[in-house]
């Protein structure tokens, strides 16, 4: 049985009873937790404030919306997930959840997340949440991911919108502050994802997903990571210069950014194995979390 037949036959396997854990995994909990955290930062950094109960509802809606997008992404990508070592244990691939069941679950969650955001919070945040879900599923997952080398650059906008949604849920508007939060994640996403693609290159090549290392090679990808790392360093300092944060943020963000640059330079000159790419990938996760944590604690 070849790879294509194996992936097509996923829809014909006998499925065991699904568990709560399977549905949690279907929602990509690691991604969802980062989405909720950055969404909270957007709420915290907004000039106004919400009633605590409404704030919790907004965060739940953001979480459910992110989970719905993750579930539909797994439904659509089940064929290539079956071919990649990194994703072969996902619920649909290993037969824990049926494909149609996953799609229904994702669509229902998407509807309720947007509906309750509009009903309980405000229309703008609901509209932004709907756009984010649509963008991630239709623009990134169904179109760009398998067709463009710039898939993660353009598609990364979806992952950068949660703080904008959080900000809008409190203020009812989109401002320069929320755009800067968007830009930090938007510029962070390509180097983070390309580092992953460097040490998962064989998987992406096998699935014919046009990630940059597959199409342009490792050296070109490392150059792009370095360029984006410089842009990220500059962008991460913007909150101080527009009055969002204090001098403590500026100093620590600069140090974190310099370390990010150090890892990207080390990666560029590394010709051995994938260890440096894995180190860079791990640090990039820590970096984004700590930058937003700093913004929360150092807001003006």
Swiss-Prot record:
Cellular-component GO terms for this entry: plasma membrane
InterPro entries: Protohaem_IX_farnesylTrfase, UbiA_prenyltransferase, UbiA_prenylTrfase_CS, UbiA_sf
Catalysed reaction equations from the record: heme b + (2E,6E)-farnesyl diphosphate + H2O = Fe(II)-heme o + diphosphate
UniProt keyword list: Cell inner membrane, Cell membrane, Heme biosynthesis, Membrane, Transferase, Transmembrane, Transmembrane helix
Enzyme Commission number: 2.5.1.141
Annotated membrane topology: Multi-pass membrane protein
Pathway: Porphyrin-containing compound metabolism; heme O biosynthesis; heme O from protoheme: step 1/1
Entry's localization field: Cell inner membrane
Keyword Electron transport: no
Transmembrane segments: 31-51, 52-72, 92-112, 123-145, 152-172, 179-199, 225-245, 247-267, 280-300
Keyword presence, Membrane: yes
Domain of life: Bacteria
GO molecular function: protoheme IX farnesyltransferase activity
GO biological process per UniProt: heme O biosynthetic process
HAMAP family assigned to the protein according to its UniProt record, in alphabetical order: CyoE_CtaB
Family: Belongs to the UbiA prenyltransferase family. Protoheme IX farnesyltransferase subfamily.
Note: Carbon 2 of the heme B porphyrin ring is defined according to the Fischer nomenclature.
Function (record text): Converts heme B (protoheme IX) to heme O by substitution of the vinyl group on carbon 2 of heme B porphyrin ring with a hydroxyethyl farnesyl side group.
Record-given protein name: Protoheme IX farnesyltransferase
Native source organism of the sequence: Rickettsia bellii (strain OSU 85-389)
């Amino acid at each position: 049985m070849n790879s294509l037949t194996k992936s097509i036959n996923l829809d014909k396997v006998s499925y065991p009873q699904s568990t709560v854990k399977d549905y949690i995994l279907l929602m990509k909990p690691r991604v969802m937790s980062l989405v909720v955290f950055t969404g909270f930062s957007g709420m915290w950094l907004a000039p106004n404030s919400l009633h605590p109960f409404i704030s919790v509802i907004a965060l739940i809606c953001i979480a459910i919306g992110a989970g719905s997008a993750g579930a539909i992404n797994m439904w659509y990508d089940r064929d290539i997930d079956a071919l990649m070592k990194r994703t072969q244990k996902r619920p649909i691939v290993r037969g824990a959840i049926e494909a149609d069941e996953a799609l229904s679950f994702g669509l229902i969650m998407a509807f309720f997340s947007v509906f309750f955001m509009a009903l309980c919070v405000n229309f703008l945040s609901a509209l932004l949440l709907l756009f984010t879900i649509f963008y991630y599923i239709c623009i990134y997952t169904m179109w760009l991911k398998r067709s463009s080398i710039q898939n993660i650059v353009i598609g990364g906008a979806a992952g950068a919108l949660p703080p904008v949604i959080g900000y809008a849920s409190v203020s009812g508007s989109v401002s320069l502050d929320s755009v800067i939060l968007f830009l930090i994640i938007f510029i962070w996403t390509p180097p983070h994802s390309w580092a992953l693609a460097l040490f998962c290159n064989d998987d992406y090549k096998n699935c014919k997903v046009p990630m940059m290392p597959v199409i342009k090679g490792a050296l070109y990808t490392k150059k792009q990571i370095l360029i984006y790392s410089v842009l990220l360093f500059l962008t991460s300092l913007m909150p101080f210069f527009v009055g969002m944060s204090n001098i403590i943020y500026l100093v620590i963000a600069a140090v974190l950014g310099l370390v990010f640059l150090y890892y990207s330079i080390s990666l560029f000159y590394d010709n051995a194995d994938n260890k440096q790419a894995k180190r860079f990938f791990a640090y990039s996760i820590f970096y984004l979390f700590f930058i937003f944590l700093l913004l929360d604690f150092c807001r003006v």
